[in-house]
């Protein structure tokens, strides 16, 4: 099977499997504010991702590319919607285009359709610094995502089986590319120990890619004759990943992704410490179900509803929202307690 065929399978399986509410964000409840002393028109949702400034705290996270006409059309529509909404956009892994120049167009279309927007390049941790530079140049990227997908590779029938040297390669990439490097998980979450190693290696931000969104173990298992089903429930939830990393690295930049589906999810993720939030599966479904116009409407709706939530919480800025008091309960509370995180630090701030 070619890489392009595999990418098309990934898209179809991602849409058929969908997402479940297993992000841990349902364990998070905001403390109501009866006197917010704020007007909706005062709310400012601009944010920073490391040194990058963005007018939006949500972006279209990495999905696809290198799968021929199908992924070309998807990326074209995503780029148009991102441009019109004024939000950043990440492309899927560009390794296919580095290995097969005929696939470059499915990535280059993103910059063509969105000449002035924030665009993130994307490669796996097997990439070299030279490949990283080429990926950035290919689409005139403002940042580079390096994705960590160990579980996906292990379950993938033709996937990698060696993950040695990944941190060293990431460190080399961080020191040699001219744009900020974001290291991201792909739906299995991230621990504070892993995040610490990545910050030390030079990552400008980590995208925690929490459990509860698109499940690449399930996707790859659908492609196997004999399934490795125990990996389908493997990972750290989005909420738990955010809270435990923030407890250890309060001044470092985190991005939240992994099953976010609406403005309340976005608000909770930011209150748990994220500077920005990425959505992939939710936006892909919106595009598939309702077309480009429907996707744009969904993005705009989430941004408007986020402003409403910030208004009732009295949070004028994203920095204010990051300090909004909240209560953590259930399985997320249990996980964090066992991991040595004092959850009351969120409720009494």
Curated annotation (Swiss-Prot):
Compartment(s) where it occurs, according to its Swiss-Prot or TrEMBL record: Cytoplasm
User: Which co-factors does it depend on?
Assistant: FMN; NADPH; Mg(2+)
Residues reported to bind FMN? 62-64, 93, 122, 184, 214, 258-259, 280-281
Q: Which UniProt keywords apply?
A: Cytoplasm, Flavoprotein, FMN, Isomerase, Isoprene biosynthesis, Magnesium, Metal-binding, NADP
State where Mg(2+) binds: 153
**Residues that bind substrate, according to the entry?**
6-7, 152
Say which enzyme class the record assigns. isomerase
Which CDD domains does this one have? IDI-2_FMN (cd02811)
- The answer, when asked if Magnesium is one of the entry's keywords, is yes
Matching entries from InterPro entries are given as: Aldolase_TIM, FMN-dep_DH, IPdP_isomerase
> Gene3D superfamilies, alphabetically?
Aldolase class I
Q: Name one GO molecular function term.
A: oxidoreductase activity
- One GO cellular component, as annotated: cytoplasm
Return the EC number: 5.3.3.2
Check the record and name the SMART domains matching this protein. IMPDH
Please give the chief subcellular localization of this protein: cytoplasm
Q: Can you supply a Gene Ontology BP term from the record?
A: isoprenoid biosynthetic process
Reaction(s) catalysed by this chain's protein: isopentenyl diphosphate = dimethylallyl diphosphate
Q: Which PANTHER family does the record associate with it? A: ISOPENTENYL-DIPHOSPHATE DELTA-ISOMERASE
Subunit structure and binding partners = Homooctamer. Dimer of tetramers.
**HAMAP family attached here?**
Idi_2
Role noted for this protein: Involved in the biosynthesis of isoprenoids. Catalyzes the 1,3-allylic rearrangement of the homoallylic substrate isopentenyl (IPP) to its allylic isomer, dimethylallyl diphosphate (DMAPP).
* Protein name in UniProt: Isopentenyl-diphosphate delta-isomerase
């Amino acid at each position: 099977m070619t890489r392009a065929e595999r990418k098309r399978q990934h898209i179809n399986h991602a849409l058929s499997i969908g997402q479940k509410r297993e992000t841990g964000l349902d364990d998070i409840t905001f403390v109501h504010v009866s006197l917010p002393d704020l007007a909706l028109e005062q709310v400012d949702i601009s944010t920073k991702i490391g040194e990058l400034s963005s007018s939006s705290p949500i972006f279209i996270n990495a999905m696809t590319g290198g799968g021929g006409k199908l992924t070309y059309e998807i990326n074209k529509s995503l780029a148009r919607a991102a441009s019109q909404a004024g939000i950043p956009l990440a492309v899927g892994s560009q390794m296919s285009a580095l290995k097969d120049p005929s696939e470059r167009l499915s990535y280059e279309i993103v910059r063509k359709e969105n000449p002035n927007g924030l665009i993130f390049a994307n490669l796996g941790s097997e990439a070299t610094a030279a490949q990283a530079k080429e990926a950035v140049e290919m689409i005139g990227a403002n940042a580079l995502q390096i994705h960590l997908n160990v579980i996906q590779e292990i379950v993938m029938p033709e996937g990698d089986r060696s993950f040695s040297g990944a941190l060293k390669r990431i460190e080399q990439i961080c020191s040699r590319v001219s744009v900020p490097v974001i290291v991201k998980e792909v739906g299995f979450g991230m621990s504070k120990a892993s995040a610490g190693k990545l910050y030390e290696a030079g990552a400008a931000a980590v995208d925690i890619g929490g459990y509860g969104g698109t499940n690449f173990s399930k996707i790859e298992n659908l492609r196997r004759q004999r399934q490795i089903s125990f990996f389908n429930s493997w990972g750290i939830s989005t909420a738990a990943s955010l809270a435990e990393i923030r407890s250890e690295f309060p001044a470092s930049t985190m991005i939240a992704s992994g099953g976010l589906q609406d403005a309340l999810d976005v608000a909770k993720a930011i209150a748990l410490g994220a500077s920005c939030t990425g959505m992939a599966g939710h936006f892909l479904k919106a595009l598939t179900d309702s077309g480009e116009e429907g996707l744009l409407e969904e993005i705009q709706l989430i941004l408007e509803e986020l402003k409403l939530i910030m208004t009732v919480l009295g949070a004028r800025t994203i920095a204010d929202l990051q300090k909004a008091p909240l209560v953590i309960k259930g399985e997320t509370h249990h996980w964090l307690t066992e991991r040595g995180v004092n959850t009351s630090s969120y409720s009494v701030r």
